[in-house]
Amino acid sequence: MMNRVKIGTALLGLTLAGIALPALAQPQSGPQTGVVFRNTVTGEALDVSQGKEGGRDTPAVKKFLETGENLYIDDKSCLRNGESLFATSCSGCHGHLAEGKLGPGLNDNYWTYPSNTTDVGLFATIFGGANGMMGPHNENLTPDEMLQTIAWIRHLYTGPKQDAVWLNDEQKKAYTPYKQGEVIPKDAKGQCKPLDE
């Protein structure tokens, strides 16, 4: 009787191992990154391989997915594009200067979601959505376009420099906030090509 129990237990263990091991050997869905992006409301991991095609292979996106650093933050060519993307995708709810309308203001140091003080958190909110009318924008903006939009939002910031955690010390010293009427030239040199017109 004891041998039958041992054999049964061993067979059960082998069966479970046979089921579990192939599942463990399967590749994970989506690209593996150094940063885990989480839904702003639920905390669930976001699959950044989903959404609008393109805009995932730029050096800036690769760096951001690995480190959470947005290389576009102070690049004039990316600010130019971010302004246009923000105007079409965000300003209807957040205001032309991110001062807030139906949605909260994004240009001061009060954040409805504290995670949005970081570029990783703001990216996750744009990508996966939040409460209320803030739906996910991963179907109408690529990750590269999201980074350009974030750069523009950060450029509109009017709060104290010390609260701008997305800027490093060198960037804080050089930071010049947006001045109404400021125009960034279409031919501004930098990492971002002009958007298709």
Swiss-Prot record:
Gene that encodes the chain: moxG
Organism in which the protein naturally occurs: Methylorubrum extorquens (strain ATCC 14718 / DSM 1338 / JCM 2805 / NCIMB 9133 / AM1) (Methylobacterium extorquens)
Modifications after synthesis and translation: Binds 1 heme c group covalently per subunit.
GO process terms (BP): methanol metabolic process
Recorded coiled-coil stretches: none
Record-given protein name: Cytochrome c-L
NCBIfam families xref list: cytochrome_MoxG
Signal sequence range: 1-25
Cell location: Periplasm
UniProt cross-references to SUPFAM superfamilies, sorted A to Z: Cytochrome c
Domain of life: Bacteria
